[in-house]
């Protein structure tokens, strides 16, 4: 068993893949403990580790294999001299063979079993959620739930209201293990776990959408089947720190670290809404990320009002007509407004390394010709990363942001396939997708990034990493991880509000790496 700490890549398997691995694991279990027995032991050990002096361990058990894991855990806790109570959902139901055997063992040991929720708990008690796990079936808001589903929702709500700390077994009940969405989308009822012990595999839904909030501190027990994971292609992989950069040579010069040009920042004269700050933030991020030269190109370039002075003296200003699109990396769209539409055809056709953000994506979503130009870039060996938030992704997919959020992994993969580029779908558990690559879910970042301008910072950082020689996919993975890590470190030190400007200043470049 290990506590997940995001410092190394981790394969993520969806429910179908986990079932496949479970079958492989069961096939090789002979006279030793069953997978359920191993799972129950792991749950009991973790329960004791996180709450060693709990007055009582309440084990809430559903009718399936997840409930069986909980029953096995109850047996161990009882045998170790702890006060244990089992709350059994619909005891009259027929249970899987292993779970029925575990229930018989619970009864034989004289462990207290009840079929109704307790009215109240000691605040120091520990609840073990073994109700659903990955056995969750999706319930759409418009469908009529069955009596069993209604009862389970009542249990989930009841356990939530009891207020004691919860250890979830595999996946918090009410959370979809594949998508990180809630089973009941109309009311969002789910278990809010303090800890989650994932069993056999790590699941993508625990790291994106609502997963990170619902799971709390995450642990993994592979039940001795880690070697079997190599036989199944994962649904995704957890992002990890980028590969270490080489020590810069003493003879390096500013050209050694790449050029980045930021195109955007629509003038206030056009629509009464100046957005030059978006370019300044992206430029600051690129500069602090170690780019050798950073240029700002404010739009429209033929307007006197576009002669905005960059906030940082180190950032050079360029007229769009004078910009060499084939050199370095181009970041296009940050605060671009309507003006970005005029420069996009040239940017899409000529730039070699390109990051498209914000208004550039909105323009492409409205114009089939621009969309085709974007698709053609891959055939010309031109490299593109797009960085939509859910609403921008929805516009590109001609759907709603709700549908995008319902399955973030699928949405990002669909966009990558359609537009022939690397996609960074921003949000909790940012998804990075590219055709022919295993999709990546990012574990870093927090709500401090939910403020204006942080997306511009990410775009500038991404441009710098591309300019420094990383491939489009590598640059996306590295930038997203670093971007989130800065916000996580800020929370650790409990500093004041994190602004986008401060976020950009805290990014580090390869020249500052320790060696």
Language-model region placement:
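Small-residue (G/A/S/T)-rich helix-start motifs and N-terminal tracts that mark the onset
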Residues: 1-90, 95-96, 100, 193-195, ...
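N-terminal small/polar loop signature for handling phosphorylated ligands or for N-terminal nucleophile
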Residues: 72-160, 305-323
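Internal gly/pro-rich beta-alpha loop/helix module
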Residues: 125-126, 131-233
């Amino acid at each position: 068993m290990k506590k997940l700490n995001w410092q190394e890549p981790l394969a993520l398997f969806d429910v179908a893949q986990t079932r496949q691995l479970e079958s492989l694991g069961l096939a090789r279990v002979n006279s030793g403990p069953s997978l359920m027995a191993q799972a129950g032991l792991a749950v009991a050990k973790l329960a004791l580790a996180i709450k060693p002096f709990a007055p009582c361990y309440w084990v809430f058990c559903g009718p399936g294999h997840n409930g069986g894991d909980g029953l096995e855990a109850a047996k161990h806790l009882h045998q170790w001299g702890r006060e244990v109570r089992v709350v059994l959902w619909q005891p009259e139901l027929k249970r899987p063979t292993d779970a029925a055997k575990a229930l018989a063992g619970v009864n034989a040991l004289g462990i207290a079993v009840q079929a109704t929720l307790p009215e109240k708990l000691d605040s120091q008690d520990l609840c073990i959620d073994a109700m659903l796990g990955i056995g969750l079936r999706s319930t759409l808001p418009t469908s009529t739930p069955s009596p069993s589903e209604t009862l389970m929702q009542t249990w989930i709500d009841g356990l939530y209201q009891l207020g004691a700390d919860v250890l979830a077994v595999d996946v918090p009940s009410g959370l979809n293990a594949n998508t990180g969405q809630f089973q009941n989308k109309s009311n969002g009822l789910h278990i809010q776990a303090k800890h989650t012990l994932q069993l056999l595999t790590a699941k993508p839904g625990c790291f994106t959408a609502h997963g990170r909030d619902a799971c709390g501190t995450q642990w993994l027990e592979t039940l001795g089947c880690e070697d079997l994971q190599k036989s199944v292609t994962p649904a995704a992989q957890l992002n990890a720190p980028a590969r270490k950069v080489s020590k810069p040579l003493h003879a390096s010069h500013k050209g050694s670290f790449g050029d980045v040009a930021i195109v955007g920042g629509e003038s206030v004269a056009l629509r009464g809404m100046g957005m030059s700050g978006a370019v300044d933030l992206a430029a600051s991020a690129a500069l602090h990320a170690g780019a050798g030269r950073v240029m700002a190109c404010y739009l429209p370039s033929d307007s006197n009002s576009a002669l905005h002075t960059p906030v940082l003296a180190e950032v050079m200003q360029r007229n769009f007509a004078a910009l060499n699109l084939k050199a370095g990396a181009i970041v296009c769209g940050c605060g671009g407004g309507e003006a970005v539409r005029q420069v996009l055809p040239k940017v899409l056709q000529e730039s070699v390394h390109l990051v498209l953000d914000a208004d550039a994506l909105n323009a492409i979503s409205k114009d089939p010709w621009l969309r085709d130009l974007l698709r053609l870039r891959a055939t010309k060996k031109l490299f593109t990363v797009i960085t939509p938030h859910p609403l921008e992704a929805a516009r590109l997919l001609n759907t709603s942001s709700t549908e995008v959020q319902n399955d973030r992994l699928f949405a990002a993969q669909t966009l990558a396939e359609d537009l022939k580029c690397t996609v960074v779908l921003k949000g909790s558990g940012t998804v990075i997708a590219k055709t022919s690559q295993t999709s990546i879910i990012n574990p870093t970042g927090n709500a401090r990034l939910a403020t204006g301008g942080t997306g511009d910072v990410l775009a500038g950082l991404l441009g710098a990493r591309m300019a420094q020689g990383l491939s489009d996919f590598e640059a996306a993975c590295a930038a997203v991880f670093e971007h989130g890590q800065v916000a996580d470190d800020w929370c650790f030190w409990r500093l004041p509000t994190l602004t986008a400007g401060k976020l950009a200043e805290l990014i580090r470049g390869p020249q500052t790496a320790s060696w």
